Amino acid sequence: MTRVPARPLAISLGDPAGIGPEVVAKCWDQRSAFNLPPFVAIGDPRSLAGVWDGPFELIDDPRQADAVFDYALPMFQITAADGGIPGHPTVAGAHCSLDSLEIAVGLARSGSAAAVVTGPVSKEQLYSIGFAHPGQTEFVAERCGVSSGNVAMMLAGPTLRTVPVTTHVPFAEVAERLSASLIEARGRTTLRGLQRNFGIAEPILAVTGLNPHAGEGGMLGREEIELIQPAIAALRAEGWKVTGPHPADTMFHEGARARYDAALCMYHDQALIPLKAIHFEDGVNVTLGLPIIRTAPDHGTAFDIAGQDLADPRPMASAIQMAAMCAANREMAE
């Protein structure tokens, strides 16, 4: 990482019974090896104490993080408290994870934190306390005053970035959910995100087809002709560099990846399978279209291994590194 933001990052620990507290603590332990900038952990200190015996220091202002970070993990204590038992999610833990997320987003929105990195949460537990959003992405978007339809989920690694047009949709419903306007909107959000977050002045977006061989001229489906090509044409008319639709099976080898900055894919697995095959340990979830930077490691709570010192901190470290890079790029542009 060549640049760091001027302000610290805010990291929500996620569900206290999951691996979030452990991987954040391990990131602080290995901050030099991972080349991490100062960050503030937000959660219940007891969730750290159950999995880690390192030093932490409570702070009430992110500006204090720089002075603390060298010798202790700076920490914001949340109002909802639940130290939790690793591997045993509770309703109290759901309140804890939601409170930490709320505070992290608030710090970023106020400008006190350069970016938000969100730890993994249990949607099942959140739904049990009345959480009304499909996931953290939609919650963050609402708090930022952005319609969830105007954000995009990017999965990013060192050599590949992918964005699905449709996300958590049953495969049987993908074709009926697609529209030229949706493809165009996701493409535009992606291109703007490549400029703002990644500092790419003239990004190139490669668009996949939906059907085998990108429809084979309409022989294997007409979505490419009726939906995808019009969306590409509209983006090109705005001056963006967009290619496709390309057959998805030839888009992700090394030579193909060198020809674009991000791939816009039609459905969830079309985007996530190549990313996870190539960047399983260091793939990062980046939410595009927000006024703040938000990243997350591409893994869940892993309750089955929580508290056993088995959690790999590399995905969280990658999410922190990417948040710092995106925040620094925005600061330079502003």
Task: Report residues per predicted region.
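Short, flexible loop segments at boundaries between secondary-structure elements
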Residues: R143-L160, L288-D304
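Ligand-binding beta-strand-loop-alpha-helix segment within the catalytic cores
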Residues: L155-A185
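Contiguous, glycine/small-aliphatic-enriched amphipathic segments in soluble metabolic enzymes
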Residues: M1-E138, R177-M266, Q270-I293, H299-T301, ...
